[in-house]
Amino acid sequence: MLREMLGCCKVYISEARNKTALEAIERALKPFPPAAIVNKFEDAAYGRVGYTVVSSLANGSSSSLKNAVFAMVKTALDTINLELHCGSHPRLGVVDHICFHPLSQTSIEQVSSVANSLAMDIGSILRVPTYLYGAAEKEQCTLDSIRRKLGYFKANREGHEWAGGFDLEMVPLKPDAGPQEVSKAKGVVAVGACGWVSNYNVPVMSNDLKAVRRIARKTSERGGGLASVQTMALVHGEGVIEVACNLLNPSQVGGDEVQGLIERLGREEGLLVGKGYYTDYTPDQIVERYMDLLNNS
């Protein structure tokens, strides 16, 4: 039964260089078994780390997952100052994005309930403007739409980087939880629930951001490309720009299809395209890793 009643939460934090802060965030989860971190993906160029947290939701108990993630969020807000942060990946806050996914036989309603409860606590206790999206929000609004309204995709520093604290003293979009006043040092948080999303990034060996943006645009559903694919072109170190892809329906459109299209578009632009990579495991691999962690603990 345990194997069939698991919830997954991905927590994206705007930091990758401050090891002391990251270690504190990881320690914060430990008092809440059976919650466990099954994957950590750090990217120094982006100034971003993604944690994949899994816990049992059996017998109606979701407190372990919620409490573990809340502790990680609180520690991140206590140890990281957005005003000192810079990176080539957009962000709206210290804790930029939290997404819950059902694993195995767990329902989207179960993880949506956890997401909603967590968001209310972040807003009311930590006093950070918090936005709900996907199945956790009554209108089913998308993460993309919230980000666009809050200016997520507009870099604010030369070199196509995002740097410093949140630009506004008041958020222009009323949050689902928390105040409209926003701390420059903390920013805002988006919390949602949805089916599985895979992140697949493809490096293009170029400094021509306009050309890679054309490739990214033509790859995305929004630009007439692949269904259920969202993309951004992001500088990723010297001489490399990545087409960062969200695969919203990876069972239908996966990394191989994305890779093939970007390679073809790259040839049309006269650019060399490298082999892409996933930033996380598949749901089945995550369940397997979690069960191994439990059995070996």
UniProtKB/Swiss-Prot annotation:
Which GO cellular component term is one of those annotated?
A: Golgi apparatus
Is DNA-binding included in the keywords of this UniProt record?
no
Record region (Formiminotransferase N-subdomain) = 2-196
Task: Name the pathway it acts in.
Answer: One-carbon metabolism; tetrahydrofolate interconversion
- List GO BP terms, alphabetically: root development; secretion; tetrahydrofolate interconversion
Catalytic reactions on record: (6S)-5-formyl-5,6,7,8-tetrahydrofolate + L-glutamate = N-formyl-L-glutamate + (6S)-5,6,7,8-tetrahydrofolate + H(+); 5-formimidoyltetrahydrofolate + L-glutamate = N-formimidoyl-L-glutamate + (6S)-5,6,7,8-tetrahydrofolate
What function does this protein fulfil? Answer: Involved in the regulation of root growth. May regulate sorting and/or transportation of trans-Golgi network (TGN) vesicles in root cap peripheral cells, thus influencing the extracellular secretion of mucilage components in the root cap.
Q: Which GO terms describe its molecular function?
A: folic acid binding; transferase activity
Active site at which residues? H89 (for formimidoyltransferase activity)
Q: Which keywords belong to this entry?
A: Golgi apparatus, Transferase
| Name of the protein in its database record | Formiminotransferase cyclodeaminase-like protein
Family membership noted in the UniProt record: Belongs to the formiminotransferase family.
Give tissue specificity per the record: Expressed constitutively in roots, stems, leaves and flowers.
Spell out the PANTHER family in the cross-references: FORMIMINOTRANSFERASE N-TERMINAL SUBDOMAIN-CONTAINING PROTEIN (PTHR12234:SF1), FORMIMINOTRANSFERASE-CYCLODEAMINASE (PTHR12234)
The record's section on Pfam families has: FTCD_N (PF07837)
Its localization reads: Golgi apparatus, trans-Golgi network
Positions bound to folate:
G178, P179, Q180, E181, V182, S183, K184, A185, K186, G187
Q: What is its EC number?
A: 2.1.2.5
